[in-house]
């Protein structure tokens, strides 16, 4: 596989984190995992040169029900419009600030499916941005740096378990589906990649906790991950009786599962509300 940054007459731009998927076997495997169906409401983040876009449109789109896509590179937008016409509705802009809820169908039921080969330089902030739209999302299928996927699905007690693990596992059921080697891209990235499936927990499955408070507690816990929680969460002792909560502070952040972090966040929020 060539290391050239040019593919199909387009130069991949480092500032957009562009690595174009060119392995048709991998593309077929991704489409098989997504299983797009005619008439579904779906949006692709960063369609690039349309390697995944084309096969998905073939299974999903009609003139009255197009595939949606969010693309920042205006050079690519023109090419995509010319290639796919009314079967693709393009939204020019940055996925980090895009309102994905605007694409969902009106109503209380989840209606939106999100897919994409996410730019690796913004993957974590983009995943956090997407959390706010989880109530309208059916599922998400993303190509990401393998190291990020491993952190997303990591279990407590492992080195990969992180703030990202806790916050995303609180909101989604996630499965790593496919390993993707660097040579599947043009230009090849310097890291391995993987496909992950993310399905939001149903509302009745979500713990009653303020996500902002949970995020605050988890961020504090992982701020110095090699230190004991008595150091990183010590500032909450005025609000939380950790002994009564059955929460052992003589542990490190990566040793604590999602449920325990939720209990601490609930206690913090309750103490603030009553104080």
Curated annotation (Swiss-Prot):
GO MF term list: 16S rRNA (adenine(1518)-N(6)/adenine(1519)-N(6))-dimethyltransferase activity; RNA binding
The family this protein is said to belong to: Belongs to the class I-like SAM-binding methyltransferase superfamily. rRNA adenine N(6)-methyltransferase family. RsmA subfamily.
Keyword Methyltransferase attributed: yes
Domain of life: Bacteria
Job of this protein: Specifically dimethylates two adjacent adenosines (A1518 and A1519) in the loop of a conserved hairpin near the 3'-end of 16S rRNA in the 30S particle. May play a critical role in biogenesis of 30S subunits.
Protein name: Ribosomal RNA small subunit methyltransferase A
Positions of S-adenosyl-L-methionine binding: 19, 21, 46, 71, 94, 117
Keyword Cytoplasm among record annotations: yes
Gene designation: rsmA
This protein's GO CC annotations: cytosol
Organism, scientific name: Burkholderia pseudomallei (strain K96243)
NCBIfam families found in the cross-reference section: ksgA (TIGR00755)
Family matches, as HAMAP family: 16SrRNA_methyltr_A
Keyword list, A-Z: Cytoplasm, Methyltransferase, RNA-binding, rRNA processing, S-adenosyl-L-methionine, Transferase
Upper taxonomic lineage: Bacteria, Pseudomonadati, Pseudomonadota, Betaproteobacteria, Burkholderiales
EC number: 2.1.1.182
Location of this chain's protein in the cell: Cytoplasm
